[in-house]
Amino acid sequence: MSHTNVTIFHPAVFVLPGIPGLEAYHIWLSIPLCLIYITAVLGNSILIVVIVMERNLHVPMYFFLSMLAVMDILLSTTTVPKALAIFWLQAHNIAFDACVTQGFFVHMMFVGESAILLAMAFDRFVAICAPLRYTTVLTWPVVGRIALAVITRSFCIIFPVIFLLKRLPFCLTNIVPHSYCEHIGVARLACADITVNIWYGFSVPIVMVILDVILIAVSYSLILRAVFRLPSQDARHKALSTCGSHLCVILMFYVPSFFTLLTHHFGRNIPQHVHILLANLYVAVPPMLNPIVYGVKTKQIREGVAHRFFDIKTWCCTSPLGS
């Protein structure tokens, strides 16, 4: 009677080459990527500080916006610093567990942002379609439960990815053709059947995100129906203006994500470096643009930022250090 011992081999490190085919341009690509990342972190940090400090912004809509800002910082910080280390310092190696952790947070932030956008759509639906019931429907306990549901759902959907990767033996190559780790890209290096990884990696998160998109579309169809029933044009314009920034953020999040998904599946003739370059831009550009969009289109945010900077200027002028 023979016994077969199957050993699951995990490499000590994976190698991230950056953007294959564009190695000669890494240093030039790093400059706009670094500027985008700095702008994203500063913009979202300012947004969070303003929402926390300004009492008139202590409402559910801006609470969800602050959650989105935190997710944006985490998403870009999970990926961009490592990419810059590859471009600048040739730091191509990443430990196996660190690679799995990075992939987990990348996917969790993506699913989490989708859920937050759904929560913000629900907030706008209640505010416009049932304004008299807004304060009774979206109480702070309810908002807290929604926030907890967003985090719990994101964690539970992506957590199995850790075990799906750790169960695989990697005995072929340890070179991940990317600048950061993501589930399917790492799973394809395994010398075993990855059917479960492919089905789970694509179907479960995508189904949840598509469900979010459908619910957001239903919310905004009901919002538009309610808006066009308003008696005056000024009332319609005011109602729509409260949704403008949210709609911009929704488009910036979902359009690139579905474009990337479709090109991965059907764009067989698109060079690999184009896919990876778009993936790097996707985790950096929307987080940079979100606070700018809300700052430009939302009067309360603009006034809050101006108020905070005025306070800083006043403190600098009256402080002994500034005199």
Swiss-Prot record:
List UniProt keywords, sorted A-Z. Answer: Cell membrane, Disulfide bond, G-protein coupled receptor, Glycoprotein, Membrane, Olfaction, Receptor, Sensory transduction, Transducer, Transmembrane, Transmembrane helix
Coiled coil ranges: none
Disulfide linkages recorded for this protein, renumbered to the chain, are C99-C191
Q: How does it sit in the membrane?
A: Multi-pass membrane protein
Residue ranges annotated as Extracellular topological domain = 1-27, 78-101, 163-198, 261-275
Q: Show which residues sit on the Cytoplasmic side of the membrane.
A: 49-56, 123-141, 220-239, 297-323
Q: Name one GO cellular component term.
A: plasma membrane
Could you tell me where this protein is found in the cell? Cell membrane
Q: Where are the transmembrane segments?
A: 28-48, 57-77, 102-122, 142-162, 199-219, 240-260, 276-296
Q: Which GO MF terms are attached to this record?
A: G protein-coupled receptor activity; olfactory receptor activity
Q: Which domain of life is it from?
A: Eukaryota
Glycans attached where? N5
Alphabetical list of Pfam families matching this protein? 7tm_4
Q: What does this protein do?
A: Odorant receptor.
What family is reported? Answer: Belongs to the G-protein coupled receptor 1 family.
* This protein's name: Olfactory receptor 52B2
